[in-house]
């Protein structure tokens, strides 16, 4: 801080700044100076943003003898709501009313800050300009009638009162760090001068030192090098003031936080290290709605009012911000996995409670909270109410569900909870500008307010400040890095407000109103950066996506140089460099105990053939992927329905001769009963999956498919169906497996056929090879039906009904392939040899699983891995390289 500025503050001079961050920066600098001077205590410096100074003066007037004629100040949320009401009433066809209102409110603020309203009629107005003029007149009319004012006009209101003795005014005031004083600000300072206050302007003095321009490969490398540079400067001097200026901070915020965190605290992502004390602070806050605590509140509120995505309900169930979350955390996670098997993609609160009641998940606190929440919704959250009434109801509803949870909140959560209460208070204050509304509208508006509220938790003072281009104005640093200064990004393009004439904005000199104004502002900011620190680095990326970039012309005069930086390693690399590594063979699991039961049936063999690790993870460790709730029936469920209908039909018909003798009407009635029972069964399992006419449509589909299939069966010779949906226990390679065999037929001459229904594509080749894709039919053959003369898939598919199988004899089954077959390259020369090949191959696969073979060995990489649930577990990407498509991950 400049010594003369500190002396003036000590003498009682007030300082106003263009933003809160600069005010806090000056306060910190002033307090540090007092500590260094050895003072045990000192008066608080009167340093605050100009907007806060104006509000303080307004507050003095509000509690003085002039309060009776003073307009009441609207909060920003009230302004936004009033503009929305005016626009909605004037133009019922406009869809994006909140977005339009935000731009109109910005136009209103610009018009007052730059004194544009008196000049508005001197410029031709387009449709948007005329709309703004009409809406603004309506806004002013309501303001006069209701005696309102707003942030855009408050400085003018206060300026008219400054001559009053009751209004507190400093003897002297310095406006510090203003890049440009706008007309309204100049009028306010003039009014202060007339009222007897000495007003002067000031800013930080220029500093010399090293200046360089640095080219980086891309924005990621640019951020990484800036982080390494900042850490190096901090390690060299723990008291250094370090600034990182990012013109497009909102765009790069997440990458900056991730990379700076990894460079400053390499172990920040380790479990248990929830909130490390980072030495940097990012000025740009995030929407309040993005904080987990606030998001959980909205998930609960939205579930009370309408159906929501199951994924959102899942997040709510597992949220730590509900009552009993810590006590039931594991059981709630297990409940979530169970609900996914029966839930639809969207759920209501009542439907969610019904689903939970069907599972014995052991979550009594969750059930009690949700039940009470549903009761409160019916008792209180209905009808049309005022915003303040809804605010009370929302607070009470969240209390009923146990928000914000039973565990203690950390610092960020605690501050977010406090900000949530402030948001509810702002919402309650909308009574002044909004009529009564329904619950859904109230929650929607509250969420929009949370999205519009940028929140940055308070942190201790840190040496590294990451700032936007305007926030660095007036601040001094020992080291300053400005990034992103490519020819595409700097200067930024103009952003004129669409509701004000562009010619007016250009004529008035609004910085973002024209290309010339944007260029001039960027030139001034660039010049200021170059004289605000002892060391200044200006960087730019050479590439973005597939485009080549150059340095901005505004920094071309700064010499381009290389910058030597320490090579900070990541936590992973640091571990490897210590060389204290243990090597462990992870391809061998403990063998199965003799007689140990293994679930999964024939899928154990199929999965081990596809990849030994997949079988180990799924069938020994139980590492199943989470189900994705789906609407209606998925392919597996449709196939199950077909299986059940045909199984019931053959359980009644039994023989080919009986099928031939069954009349069309009788057969239709039989299939209709079978379809009815199959649909009823699946509705018991998933009550909402088929209702009303959808159930009837599905029954007709099933009858149609089954009838078409039975017509194909009539083309066969005589046979008897010996078994359908038959439970079998299979012993092979030390494995004992339980499975359900779809069907076994016996021809009139005594030859048996093992059949497996398929509603998708089926091919005999899927049964062949050392690692067959579909081993179930050969497995049934060698373990339970060793004398069978054929195995076949029954492809029950509309328009493509057929048997796809292998047979000893050509006459046993339509379309069955016999051996040798030149087109089946992996088949044995004869049926007997093929059976022995199956027996040997399946025994080898089963023995491998029993012995603990857990190699990561996909049969066909990457196809085998494309839809596998255990990819993160086996780390196939690290082993073989990430060649899977992004959309398949």
Predicted regions: what they are:
Residues 402, 406, 411, 546, ...:
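RecB-family 4Fe-4S metal-dependent nuclease core
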Residues 1-660, 664-665, 676-685, 689, ...:
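Polyanion-engaging groove/track-forming segments
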């Amino acid at each position: 801080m400049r010594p003369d500025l500190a002396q003036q503050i000590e003498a009682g001079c007030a300082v106003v700044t263009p933003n809160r961050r600069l005010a806090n920066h000056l306060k910190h600098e002033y307090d540090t100076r007092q500590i260094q001077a050895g003072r045990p205590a000192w008066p608080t410096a009167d340093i605050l943003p100009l907007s806060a100074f104006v509000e303080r003066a307004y507050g003095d007037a509000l509690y003085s003898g002039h309060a009776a004629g003073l307009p009441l100040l609207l909060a920003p949320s009230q302004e936004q709501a009033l503009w929305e009401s005016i626009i909605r009433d004037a133009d019922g066809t406009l869809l994006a009313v909140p977005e339009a209102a935000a731009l109109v409110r910005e136009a209103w603020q610009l018009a007052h800050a730059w004194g544009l309203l008196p000049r508005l009629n001197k410029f031709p107005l387009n449709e948007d300009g005329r709309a703004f003029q009409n809406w603004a007149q309506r806004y002013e009319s309501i303001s006069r009638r209701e005696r309102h004012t707003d942030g855009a006009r408050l400085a003018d209101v206060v300026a008219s009162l400054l001559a009053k003795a009751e209004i507190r005014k400093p003897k002297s005031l310095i406006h510090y760090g203003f890049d440009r004083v706008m007309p309204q600000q100049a009028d306010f300072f003039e009014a202060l001068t007339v009222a007897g206050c000495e007003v002067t302007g000031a800013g930080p003095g220029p500093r010399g030192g090293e200046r360089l321009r640095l080219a980086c490969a891309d924005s990621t490398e640019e951020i990484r090098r800036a982080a390494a540079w900042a850490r190096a400067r901090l390690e060299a001097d723990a008291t250094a003031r370090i600034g990182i200026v990012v013109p497009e901070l909102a765009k790069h915020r997440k990458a900056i936080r991730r990379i700076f965190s990894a460079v400053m605290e390499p172990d920040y992502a380790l479990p248990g290290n929830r909130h490390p004390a980072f030495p940097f602070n990012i000025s740009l806050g995030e929407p309040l709605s993005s904080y987990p605590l606030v998001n959980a509140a909205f998930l609960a509120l939205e579930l009370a009012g309408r159906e929501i995505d199951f994924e959102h309900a899942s997040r709510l169930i597992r949220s730590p911000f509900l009552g009993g979350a810590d006590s039931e955390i594991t059981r709630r996670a297990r409940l979530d996995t169970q609900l996914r098997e029966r839930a639809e993609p969207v759920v209501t609160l009542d439907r969610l409670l019904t689903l939970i009641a069907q599972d014995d998940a052991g979550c009594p606190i969750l059930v009690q909270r949700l039940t009470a929440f549903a009761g409160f919704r019916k008792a209180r959250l209905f009808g049309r109410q005022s915003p303040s009434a809804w605010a009370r109801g929302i607070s009470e509803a969240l209390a009923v569900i146990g928000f914000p949870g039973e565990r203690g909140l950390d610092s960020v959560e605690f501050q977010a909870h406090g900000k949530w209460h402030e948001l509810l208070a702002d919402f309650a204050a909308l009574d002044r500008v909004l009529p009564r509304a329904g619950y859904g509208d109230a929650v929607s508006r509250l969420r929009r307010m949370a999205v519009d509220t940028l929140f940055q938790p308070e942190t201790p003072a840190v040496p590294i400040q990451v700032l936007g281009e305007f926030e660095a104005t007036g601040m001094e640093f020992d080291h300053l890095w400005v990034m992103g200064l490519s020819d595409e990004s700097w200067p930024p393009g103009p952003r004129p407000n669409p509701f004000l004439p562009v010619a007016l904005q250009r004529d008035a000199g609004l910085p973002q109103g024209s290309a010339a104004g944007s260029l001039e502002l960027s030139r001034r900011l660039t010049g200021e950066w170059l004289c605000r620190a002892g060391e200044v680095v200006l960087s730019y990326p050479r590439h973005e996506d597939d485009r080549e970039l150059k340095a901005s012309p505004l920094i071309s005069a700064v010499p381009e140089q290389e910058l030597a930086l320490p090579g900070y390693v990541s936590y992973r690399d640091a571990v490897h460099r210590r060389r204290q590594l243990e090597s462990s063979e992870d391809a061998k699991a403990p063998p199965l105990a003799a007689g140990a039961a293994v679930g999964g049936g024939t899928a154990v063999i199929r999965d081990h053939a596809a990849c030994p690790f997949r079988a180990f993870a799924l069938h020994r460790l139980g590492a199943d992927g989470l189900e994705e709730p789906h609407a209606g029936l998925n392919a597996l469920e449709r196939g199950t329905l077909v299986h059940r209908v045909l199984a019931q039909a053959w359980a009644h018909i039994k023989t080919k001769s009986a099928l031939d003798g069954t009349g069309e009407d009788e057969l239709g009635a039989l299939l209709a009963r079978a379809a009815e029972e199959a649909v009823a069964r699946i509705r018991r399992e998933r009550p909402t999956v088929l209702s009303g006419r959808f159930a009837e449509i599905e029954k007709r589909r099933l009858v149609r498919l089954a009838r078409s299939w039975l017509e194909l069966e009539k083309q066969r010779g005589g046979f008897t169906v010996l078994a359908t949906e038959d439970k079998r226990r299979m012993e092979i390679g030390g494995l004992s497996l339980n499975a359900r065999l779809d069907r076994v037929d016996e021809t009139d001459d005594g030859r048996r056929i093992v059949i497996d229904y398929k509603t998708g594509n089926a091919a005999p080749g899927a049964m062949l090879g050392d690692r067959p894709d579909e081993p179930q039919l050969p497995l049934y053959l060698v373990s339970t039906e060793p004398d069978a003369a054929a195995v076949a898939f029954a492809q029950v598919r509309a328009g493509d009904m057929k048997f796809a199988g292998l047979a000893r004899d050509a006459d046993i089954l339509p379309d069955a392939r016999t051996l040798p077959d030149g087109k089946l390259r992996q088949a044995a020369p004869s049926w007997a040899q093929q059976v022995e090949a199956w027996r040997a191959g399946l025994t080898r696969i089963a023995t491998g699983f029993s012995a603990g073979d857990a190699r990561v060995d996909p049969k066909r990489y990457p196809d085998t891995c494309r839809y596998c649930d255990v990819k993160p577990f086996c780390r196939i990407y690290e082993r073989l390289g990430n060649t899977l498509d992004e959309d398949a991950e």
